[in-house]
Amino acid sequence: MKKLLTLLLAMLLLAGCAGNKPGTFEAGKNTFLLNGKPFIVKAAEVHYPRIPREYWEHRIEMCKALGMNTLCLYVFWNLHEETPGNYDFTGNKDIAAFCKLAQKHGMYVIVRPGPYVCAEWEMGGLPWWLLKNDSVELRTLDPYYMERVGMFMHEVGKQLEDLQITRGGNIIMVQVENEYGSYATDKPYVSAIRDTVRAAGFTEVPLFQCDWSSNFLNNGLDDLIWTVNFGTGADIDKQFAKLREVRPETPL
């Protein structure tokens, strides 16, 4: 009996490891490729801090039951760094635990670390204490702002970089900034945020940016995947057609 239990335990451990094998995710011609095969991203937006941790698994199961295969996660800066230099990724703020729970249910994750996330959240996720610096210019190349962004992104990377699909995790893409074209035109700033995201360790999965079709040309970077936003009631074909004009082979 003891040998049988040992064998069963070994089989379970091996099965768990098999589910966490390193993989690949990339943008191919007109489609995303998961481990080299066409993959349609069906994503649900889930805000982990708005859900009590004891209900996380239930919400993930609900998303999967709706036919989703991916979860999009904003990372709320002012949640994780309520005061300067004091980072908290525990309890209901444990985004890594949420990602692992999603993987348990066969779900992939798209990380959207901002630094600005909007999401009908206070200051779009930017910490209030940034404003204690009277001269700070948010969402610009302001030295103080960029320094604090870099420090926060580094902490996010420490939590999540090992969960990239290439390392056996379930993170398949990471977003750079958020709808910046609705705020300003500043490619150097968007480029700097891209570099900050990469410096945080997100170098093994595609990076992308999202904007409205009316302004995605303003800050579009050639080395990022472009995605287009549109509201309820929009002509979807028309919106995608605008993206196809400038990126004819981009995945939709």
Ranges and model annotations:
Residues 41-44, 69-73, 109-113, 172-176, ...:
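Hydrophobic faces of well-ordered beta-strands that scaffold small-molecule active sites
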Residues 144-223:
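Active-site neighborhood of glycoside hydrolase catalytic domains
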